[in-house]
Regions:
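Secretory/organelle targeting and membrane-embedding segments
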Residues: 1-251
Length: 251
């Protein structure tokens, strides 16, 4: 009985996958709460442990240069990418029941969207931070079935040649059904309906067996009203802020 030892420090850290859907996640919560207090439970996303991800808060809220520009008046769009140049390797049994949407979008990419879009907490503590993250999720514009068809793309990698080596198709991987429709790629266009981000599209994408391995956030700023440095065809190189999370951390 962990709750019967007030002098002991007992914590439980829970990583993904935390259930298969909303109902199973709620059932797991009830199981844990029978033996632990809420303050002893840590449901973590290991992406938040990456140094560059943690630095997003300082970049935004301790920076007098970027924060005044961090809104719909100056930002045209936001792109968040997390792709890998390898397949599922030996994780077939897990991955075919999960897919890219559950494996990456609803946790890792959702956290990156929240860190990019959230309002500054009044103080830097876990509860206030979480409250601002929740506000972002509550502001996601719901999608109708028709909008899902237009704004969401799901894909699955096929056989290919990569650096002179043959790469198997997803359906040829170990423990994968030959008719599997599990996605290994997801891209979607999101909108956050609040004062700061109204009308600014957030593009997120993730996938296996892509041409490169990279996780990054790209902030695309709006062009200047008068293009002094336009090229002969009238175009200009857009201003971007790139936050590279991996493989080479940097801004």
């Amino acid at each position: 009985d962990t709750n019967g030892e007030p002098s002991a420090i007992r914590r439980i850290v829970i990583e993904k996958p935390f259930g298969y859907d909303l109902q199973s996640a709620r059932e797991l919560n009830e199981i844990y709460r029978k033996s632990f207090h809420e303050h002893q439970l840590y449901r973590i996303d290991h992406f938040l442990g990456k140094e560059t991800v943690q630095d997003i808060m300082a970049l935004r809220f301790a920076n007098g240069i970027f924060e005044p520009l961090w809104n719909r008046n100056y930002i045209e769009r936001v792109e968040i990418t997390a792709v890998e140049n390898m397949g599922i390797e030996s994780r077939g049994g897990f991955y075919d029941q999960t897919g890219a949407l559950r494996d990456m979008v609803q946790n890792h990419l959702a956290q990156l969207v929240a860190l990019t879009a959230m309002e500054p907490p009044v103080q830097f503590n876990a509860d206030l931070f979480r409250n601002e993250v929740v506000k972002v999720y509550q502001s996601f514009r719901p999608m109708t079935p028709e909008e899902i068809r237009r704004r969401v793309v799901r894909g699955q990698y096929t056989e290919s040649e990569w650096k002179g080596e043959h790469q198997r198709a997803y359906r040829e991987e170990d423990k994968i059904a030959s008719d599997s429709r599990t996605e290994t790629f997801v891209a979607m266009k999101l909108y956050i309906d609040n004062w700061r981000w109204q009308g600014v599209p957030f593009y997120i994408r993730t996938g296996k067996m892509m041409p490169t391995k990279v996780t990054e956030i790209v902030i695309h700023f709006k062009p200047t009203p008068h293009r002094v440095f336009a090229t002969a065809d009238g175009s200009t190189v857009p201003n971007q802020l790139v936050i590279r999370i991996q493989p080479n951390e940097g801004i």
